[in-house]
Design a protein with these regions (language model features):
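Non-catalytic terminal segments and appended small domains
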Residues: 1-74, 88, 97-160
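Flexible, gly/ser-rich surface segments that form the specificity/activation loops bordering the active-site cleft
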Residues: 83
Length: 160
């Protein structure tokens, strides 16, 4: 299935400081705040986590540099995404054959903000996810560390 309508199913509630989200339990998460979900056809859907979406802000545009059937590697830039707060390269987190980009985003890039774990998926790849991808519990610990660092930086800026 690559329509992104897959219900993420069971999720854990995550809260740290003022950041709150639901993290799908069956997904894998990359250190770069992408999620990866295995599909019934053996491919993997890839999207941005709610944390990444929050850092970028409301999405306004995106583009891909890889065509369907192209071979992609871990860490390869496959495209870019622009939010009101920032623009970011999209790095591949699955090694293999690039299957598709989400066609719905062409008309509604805001799906990334509104349904980042479902219809707001970015692209799909047939292959193997990055070995650094982690389960939901390890990702929650990574979020704890990341958010704590942001809060420490903010506190240091206030002191200056």
């Amino acid at each position: 299935m690559q329509d992104g309508s897959k219900n993420p199913g069971k999720a854990i509630h995550y809260k740290r400081s003022r950041f709150v989200t639901q993290l799908p339990v069956d997904y894998l998460y990359s250190p770069s705040h992408a999620w990866v979900a295995r599909q019934t056809d053996g491919s993997w859907l890839v999207g941005l986590t709610k944390f990444a979406v929050r850092m970028l802000g409301e999405m306004v545009d995106h583009g891909f540099e890889v065509e369907p059937n192209g071979i992609v590697g871990i860490g390869q830039i496959v495209g870019w995404i622009e939010g009101f707060k920032a623009i970011s390269d999209l790095f591949c987190v699955v090694e293999g054959q690039f299957v598709a980009r989400n066609p719905a985003l062409k008309e509604k890039i805001t799906l990334v903000n509104k349904d980042c774990y479902g219809q707001g998926w970015l692209y799909s790849v047939r292959g193997q996810p990055d070995a650094r991808c982690m389960d939901v519990h390890a990702y929650a610990k990574l979020l704890d560390k990341t958010i704590d660092k942001i809060l420490e930086r903010q506190k240091a800026e206030e002191i200056k």
